[in-house]
């Protein structure tokens, strides 16, 4: 019964998230228009989301949940140790990735929007906005980790509810700052990263009942860690 209830709650939040996502896109189109500012924001929004699809969505859950659930059958301590090892590898890898991309941002923009190099002001704006939004990847990937913990315990509603946060924050920013002219796109970019942080805090609040990480500087690659990354990485 609890599983059915959780699945129903998940479905409701997914529908709400999609409706809010549509409203968000409509408002962005209205207030940012279709000029260079809108183009810059869409690239800034797309780059961290492109990496998120690689690191923080289905492939991570598909690799982590079965392995973690298997460890749970062997005891809570073994499951915690496994999850903690994965968390430490994940946060280290994400920090390195975010720092490298922040430093080399113009190059990454060239990869996904090479035409921007023909307009220096557009390139500079896109670089600025993407450097603001890119930490979203760190926050949302860690949120996905804790969502996977919850999914392993048949708690699906929290992750689905968390997906609404980004849309709500961006909608509120547009409605409150719609008369801010060129500053609106800056506020929206900060809103993306702030929403990711809030989403991480929200999911962790519920996941800490089952797992709370212990940060370690020394990382050990075990057979189980290798097996996880073989499943996770393409």
Give the positions of each predicted feature:
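Membrane-embedded alpha-helical bundles of multi-pass transporters/translocases
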Residues: 1-234
């Amino acid at each position: 019964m609890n599983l059915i209830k959780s699945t129903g709650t998940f479905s409701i939040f997914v529908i709400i998230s999609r409706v809010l996502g549509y409203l968000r896109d409509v408002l962005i189109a209205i207030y940012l228009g279709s000029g260079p500012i809108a183009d810059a924001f869409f690239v800034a929004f797309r780059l961290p989301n492109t990496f998120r699809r690689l690191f923080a969505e289905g492939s991570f859950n598909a690799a982590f949940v079965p392995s973690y659930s298997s460890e749970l059958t062997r005891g809570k301590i073994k499951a915690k140790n496994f999850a903690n090892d994965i968390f430490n590898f994940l946060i280290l890898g994400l920090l390195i990735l975010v720092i490298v991309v922040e430093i080399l941002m113009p190059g990454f923009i060239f990869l996904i929007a090479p035409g921007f190099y023909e307009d220096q002001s557009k390139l500079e704006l896109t670089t600025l906005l993407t450097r603001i939004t890119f930490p979203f990847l760190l926050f949302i990937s860690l949120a996905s980790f804790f969502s996977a913990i919850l999914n392993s315990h048949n708690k699906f509603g929290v992750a689905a509810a968390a997906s609404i946060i980004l849309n709500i924050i961006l909608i509120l920013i547009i409605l409150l700052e719609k008369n801010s002219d060129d500053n609106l796109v800056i506020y929206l970019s900060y809103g993306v990263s702030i929403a990711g942080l809030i989403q991480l805090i929200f999911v962790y609040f519920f996941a800490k009942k089952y797992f709370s990480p212990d940060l370690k500087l020394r990382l050990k690659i075990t057979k189980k860690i290798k097996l996880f990354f073989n499943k996770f990485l393409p």
